[in-house]
Amino acid sequence: EEKVPYNVLKTKPVGIEKSVDEVGHISKVDETLSFQERLKGDFSQRPASITKKTAVKQVKESYSMADLNKMNDRELVETLGSIKWHQYTDL
């Protein structure tokens, strides 16, 4: 072995001796479906959108500042994000 006057790593870093295909995720969790099996899955059916239902409901209503002040933070953010400016009665 060659003598080196400075500190050199004597072992290879972890993973360098393995090919990219052999290196696994650090959690070592086995996937239930392979990549090819997931690609064969039925992607044509999607879950129903909840936002469309709430938008339809909120188009029919108007909101005063008192109504908005009664809402919790999450409900307020969802409402403000889905209603139009003309639905605010106190503006």
UniProtKB/Swiss-Prot annotation:
It comes from the Bacteria. The keyword Hydrolase applies. This is Non-hemolytic enterotoxin 105 kDa component. Keywords: Enterotoxin, Hydrolase, Metal-binding, Metalloprotease, Protease, Secreted, Toxin, Virulence, Zinc. One of its GO terms (biological process) is proteolysis. Binds 1 zinc ion. GO terms for cellular component: extracellular region. It is an enzyme of class 3 (hydrolase). GO terms for molecular function: metal ion binding; metallopeptidase activity; toxin activity. This protein is a metalloprotease with gelatinolytic and collagenolytic activity and is a component of the non-hemolytic enterotoxin complex (NHE). The keyword Repressor does not apply.
